[in-house]
Regions:
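Active-site clefts of carbohydrate-active enzymes
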Residues: 221-226, 259-265
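Catalytic alpha-helical scaffold of carbohydrate-active enzymes acting on polysaccharides/glycoconjugates
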Residues: 1-156, 161-212, 236-257, 264-328
């Protein structure tokens, strides 16, 4: 069902699926495979391959903005109390060891798979301030485990929490990744692109142009807008699909949407069903990152070169990788 390549005449809606936790891998992933497969869609699943230490993330509670997000999205409801104890009151399960069969089932269903991270919380909370040795060691641990699970080397990556550093981007070239999705396009408060021309680009790190094509997320995530007041209306489970579909109406460009196995694959699945139906009705092809890369082949040499940059996004606490204006 997923062997036919997409019709590139249609704009692509790239489904980039971040799988952060043991529970998400065990339960959410299978739901997403069925939902997307039922629509003959394609997608890329990015797996966390080492220990689930989600409980460590509670330290982020000290960060400004964290509590407003938690109260909006009900972390316990979506992640489950047990998951929030991993690494604190309970030992963190080893996702790549315990869920290898679930991961291979995604590949066997015809979906692209790639790396999210080794240890989601460890990476997200540390990589911005760590050096090359720590960074490369973590990435190679994830790559080795991926090869163990799938029997082949990984081909792509999407960073946990959109957190990276220069050494991590350089490691993509060393690993031979042709494309990745590690950052975000800057968004306005209403979810629209601050720079409508943003999209696929290459990065310049420490003055060196890298080969790996970055395909940044162009749309807000559900947890960034759920419960927020935007243009005078509160975004709720009842109207969030319509809100996101307004951002893609007209189907004038390709989009990358990041979803989470723990959200869209579980409690928020009914919203995701509305989005899938809506995007297909708008004329989009539900696509994988590999599909997008294939579509970009003709223009790969003309993509802008942008410096590595940090920034903030509405509805998300802290700094993350964002697309900067192209280098002059």
């Amino acid at each position: 069902l997923t062997e036919t390549l997409p019709n590139h005449a249609k704009p692509l809606l790239v489904l980039k699926i971040d799988v952060d936790t043991y529970r998400g891998t065990r339960e959410g992933v299978g739901h997403l495979v069925r939902m997307i497969g039922a629509r003959q869609g394609r997608a890329t699943f990015l797996f966390s391959l080492g220990p689930d230490h989600t409980g460590w993330a509670l330290r982020r509670a000290l960060r400004p903005g964290f509590f407003s997000k938690v109260s909006r999205t009900s972390v316990v409801e979506h992640y489950g109390l047990k998951t929030l104890m991993y690494g604190t009151l309970l030992p963190g399960p080893d996702i790549g060891k315990d869920c290898a069969a679930e991961m291979r089932a995604v590949r066997d269903a015809g979906f692209e798979c790639g790396i999210h991270t080794w240890d989601h919380v460890l990476w997200q909370d540390n990589v911005a301030r760590r050096g090359a040795d720590w960074t490369v060691k973590m990435m190679r641990k994830a790559a080795a485990r991926y090869a163990q699970v799938f029997g082949v080397a990984p081909r792509t990556h999407g960073a946990a929490g959109w957190q990276m550093n220069g050494a991590a981007f350089i490691e993509h070239d060393t690993a031979g990744y042709a494309y990745a999705s590690d950052g975000r396009c800057v968004l306005k408060e209403n979810g629209t692109l601050a720079n409508p021309a943003d999209g696929p680009h290459r990065l310049s790190v420490a003055g060196k142009a890298l080969k790996c094509i970055q395909m940044p997320t162009t749309l807000p995530t559900l947890d960034e807008v759920l419960g927020c007041e935007i243009d005078g209306s509160t975004i709720t489970a009842a109207n969030i699909a319509a809100f996101l579909l307004r951002l893609t109406e007209g189907a004038t460009r390709d989009h990358v949407y990041t979803l989470h196995a723990e959200l869209e694959g579980q409690k928020l699945a009914p919203i995701f069903e509305q989005l899938l139906a809506g995007w297909q009705a708008q004329g989009y092809q539900l696509a994988s990152m590999a599909d997008y890369h294939a579509k970009l082949a003709a223009v790969a040499d003309t993509l802008p070169l942008c410096p590595m940059t940090w920034g903030e996004l509405p509805g998300r606490s802290g700094q993350l990788m964002v697309q900067a204006p192209a280098a002059a």
